């Protein structure tokens, strides 16, 4: 625990020293450093290139990134509970929010101190923290090999795709969301996943590879080892930017996804700065920037006009975003370990 606190103290001291060198008056006024969690990949790049400079310009304070996945954030916050947390702002997907609230790791978001909060879509205004974007899954496919966009999850079963279908393990939101959606379409419930596993068993002859994680999954696409597979919008856009031949098709059964949100951590060292940092992510001009390549983040501010890849692949308007089907993570989270074990036992092996 002392190591975590010492490291954080060093980050803050370094920030204060840099400001002191810049000028005594500035150092006295703003010798503060915020520590904010962010996801690896596109989001860490977006925060580094867009958010951090804007935050410094607006507040005069320095923000540093802690690049870490949501589940690991929960673990670190839990380990530090009762002491100074390792970061002030948490960056979660929907499943981690439930765990963080249950364990008292985040506090209710102070809406009155966040002027941009009221501009969010109603579905993005959560009392535990604003939803800053969405992740939407569909069918990824190689347009050089598949000229007609697939419109049904059942298309994955087509014998012509033998050995060319990809899957990812259930340790990712993508894997779980795919399982839940297929289960729903096949008549299952959140208490009965037999239909989903029956579908996966039927799919096995077509499966060419099952990636252990999302990084390995991206490699399958980059090396063109798969032609068709469940994927999400943001990852497809990231690969397309690298000239990987991949497109996303939303099945006729509709889009399904989850939210990504920001949260004020319990006992945050810099709560006021944390709220300003979070509120900056809600600003319409910031979300407009993040909607464009190379970030392609789906905006949640109602004043941002949708355009580009989002309108081509996903939805045409903000009203359509509200129609994206979500997952009942309250029911799924307690089963997640059992579902992963069953997948590893029946499918992955």
Q: At which residue positions do the language-model features occur?
A:
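A bilobed periplasmic-binding-protein/Venus flytrap-type ligand-binding module shared by bacterial periplasmic
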Residues: 138-145, 181-184, 259-271, 278, ...
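Early extracytoplasmic/lumenal segment of secretory-pathway proteins
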Residues: 30-98
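N-terminal secretory signal peptides and thylakoid transit peptides that target proteins
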Residues: 1-18
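Extracytoplasmic ligand-binding site segments that recognize negatively charged/polar headgroups
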Residues: 41-48, 86-225
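Conserved C-terminal helix/tail region of periplasmic/extracytoplasmic solute-binding proteins
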Residues: 320-349
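Periplasmic-binding protein-like
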Residues: 135, 198-203, 240-266, 302
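A ligand-binding cleft/hinge motif common to bilobed small-molecule-binding domains
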Residues: 97-99, 222, 227-245
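Mature extracytoplasmic/periplasmic domains
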Residues: 265-324
């Amino acid at each position: 625990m002392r190591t975590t606190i010492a490291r954080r103290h060093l980050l803050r001291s370094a920030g204060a020293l840099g400001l002191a060198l810049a000028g005594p008056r500035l150092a006295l006024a703003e010798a503060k450093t915020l520590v904010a969690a962010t996801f690896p990949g596109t989001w860490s790049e977006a925060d580094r290139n867009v958010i951090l400079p804007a935050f410094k310009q607006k507040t005069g304070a320095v923000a540093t990134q802690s690049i870490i996945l949501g589940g690991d954030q929960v673990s670190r916050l839990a380990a530090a509970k009762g002491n100074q947390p390792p970061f002030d702002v948490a960056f979660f997907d929907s499943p981690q929010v439930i765990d963080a609230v249950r364990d008292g790791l985040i506090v209710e978001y102070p809406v009155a101190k966040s002027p941009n909060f009221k501009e969010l879509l109603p579905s993005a205004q959560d009392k535990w923290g604003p939803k800053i974007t969405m992740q939407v899954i569909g069918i990824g496919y190689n347009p050089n090999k598949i000229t007609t966009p697939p419109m049904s999850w059942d298309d994955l079963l087509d014998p012509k795709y033998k050995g060319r279908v990809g899957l990812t393990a259930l340790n990712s939101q993508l894997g779980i969301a795919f399982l839940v959606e297929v289960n729903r379409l096949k008549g299952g419930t959140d208490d009965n996943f037999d239909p989903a596993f029956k579908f996966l068993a039927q799919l096995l002859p077509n499966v060419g590879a099952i990636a252990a994680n999302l990084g390995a999954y991206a490699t399958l696409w980059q090396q063109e080892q798969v032609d068709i597979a469940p994927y999400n919008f943001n990852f497809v856009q990231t690969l397309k930017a690298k000239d990987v031949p991949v497109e996303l098709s939303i099945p006729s059964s509709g889009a399904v996804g989850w939210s990504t949100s920001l949260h004020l951590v319990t006992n945050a060292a810099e709560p006021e700065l944390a709220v300003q940092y979070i509120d900056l992510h809600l600003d319409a001009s910031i979300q407009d920037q993040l909607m464009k390549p190379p970030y392609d983040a789906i905006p949640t501010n109602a004043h941002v006009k949708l355009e580009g890849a989002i309108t081509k692949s996903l939805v045409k308007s903000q009203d359509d975003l509200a129609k994206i089907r979500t997952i009942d993570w309250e029911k799924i989270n307690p089963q997640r370990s059992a579902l992963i074990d069953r997948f590893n036992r029946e499918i992955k092996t």
